[in-house]
Amino acid sequence: MLKYKFNVGDALDRVGFTSYKAKTSGILSQDTLKKIKKEDTNISLKAINSLCMILDMQPKDLLIYEETDTEKEQKEKL
């Protein structure tokens, strides 16, 4: 399961990327911004690209993969 390494919503707030900026710039949709603030990683690659641009980071700086029990079971069946 992919997880954020830190609170990305807070990081966006720190750099001044508000809901208003999301709406007016079109860089991130408001729905995507809501997902990010809820720590939902089910966002598009385009959104991850935008986060990297806004926060001046690489994807590996944003996300980490932690294997769940379900994923372990699925992997064993391969």
Model-predicted segments: where are they?
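A short, Lys/Arg-rich alpha-helix, primarily the initiator
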Residues: M1-Y20
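Residues that mark the N-terminal boundary/hinge immediately upstream of a DNA-recognition element
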Residues: N7, T18, S44-A47, Q58
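The alpha-helix within a helix-turn-helix
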Residues: L12, K23, C52
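Short alpha-helical DNA-recognition segment
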Residues: V15-K35
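Short, basic-rich loop-to-helix N-cap that marks the start of a DNA-contacting helix
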Residues: D40-M53
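Intrinsically disordered, low-complexity basic tails/linkers immediately adjacent to helix-turn-helix/homeobox/MYB/SANT
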Residues: L55-D61
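Short, charged recognition helix plus adjacent turn
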Residues: L63-L78
